[in-house]
Amino acid sequence: MRIIVDTNIIISAGLFPQSNVGKALAHIVKNHKLVLCQYTLDELKNVFKKKFPKRIEYFNKFVKKLKYELIDMDIKEYAKYPSIRDIDDIPLLANAIEAKADILITGDKDFDNIKIKTPQIIKPVEYIEKYMK
């Protein structure tokens, strides 16, 4: 399966690799195709610079070790995608749709009420229960 994850999933997995989220990301990388968009990587860099400035080198090594497919879609017409409360989340949703991801994993509640068939939008715990047991 093609699985795209949001920024917070990667941050949690990077900071806490033995956590459930860390184990889920490791499972995805081993058993599926992890898909990341350039928007997510840029957001990761910004978050680490602001919140974890002393761990930037660790972050860079962590991301370099991940096996993933990078997509860099220049999406300009956000109006054609389902609406979402936080407009900053539209690039992730749009990239997930355009990359034909099977699953989008996020803990962001803004994605809870989006009604689309593909990708299936699930929380990390749902991924663990459904695919890791």
Language model features with spans:
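Residues that mark the start of a beta-strand
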Residues: 1-2
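PIN/NYN-family metal-dependent endoribonuclease catalytic core
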Residues: 5, 15, 21-50
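A secondary-structure boundary/capping signal
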Residues: 6-7, 37, 107, 124
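Alpha-helix capping/helix-boundary segments
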Residues: 9-10, 40, 92, 110-111, ...
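Domain-scale selection of a single, long terminal region
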Residues: 42-76, 92
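Active-site neighborhoods of divalent-metal-dependent phosphate/nucleic-acid chemistry enzymes
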Residues: 69-103, 109
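Acidic, PIN/NYN-like endoribonuclease modules and their adjacent C-terminal/linker elements
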Residues: 82, 109-133
